[in-house]
Every structure is written in structure tokens, then in C-alpha cells.
Amino acid sequence: MRGPDDTSGPVGPGPAEEPPSPPARPGITLTAAQRAVDAWISRFEEGYWPPLTNLARLVEEVGELARELNHRYGHKPKKAEEPDQDLGLELADILFVLLALANEQGIDLDARFAEVLEKYEVRDGERWTRRR
């Protein structure tokens, strides 16, 4: 699809409240994830949905995450019969739609995410107190 795979593992902060789920594919990159989404979508005649449909899907998935976070940490308790949702799966649903949207638009998220990390480092690297 877009460039060689990066074999380095994921980088980021540690778990906040719940331990991370084990990755389906250890060390998967955004490029590899985009390829996996492309392979899955390419199996179907309909192919990629239009950008505005994917935006609606993204908003729907973010709404599901917001609902769960509101139940856990906000002022809206769940109904007794309503089960807890898996936050990791809710986030992965959002990621899937983002990957599909990036693919449909021809965007290499590995490259763009590296640019965003650099942007944050330059813009915000001295904004907060560093850990010692």
C-alpha cells in the first residue's frame, strides 16, 4: 500500500486505569493497520464508503465511547441491565473508521502521525513540567 512497514513496537504512555489489551498483531504499525483495513474492505463490492458516511460512522463510534466514559466517570449512571462496554474495543472501533477514512483519502497515517508528534514537541515541549 504505502511504504515499508516499520517493525518497531508501539510507543506511548502507560495504562491510565485499566491494563491494555494484548495487541492482535504485536508491533503493528499504522501502515500495517491501514493495509489490514484495506484488505478487509477490498473483499466487498461496495468498497470504501464516501467520506461523509465515514464521518458519520466516526461520530457514532465517538458517541459510544463518550457514553461509556460518561457512565463510568460522569453524572449519568447506567441502567441496571446495561453492561459495561470495553473501552479498548470502543477506541479500536474509532481507529478502524479513522484508518478507513485515511485509506479512502489516500493518506499515509504513519508519515502524518510522525509529523504530528514533531509538531507537538515543537509547540508544546516546554509547556508543562517535565517528569524527573
Give residue spans per PLM region.
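Flexible "arm" and connector segments at domain edges
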Residues: M1-L91, L95-R132
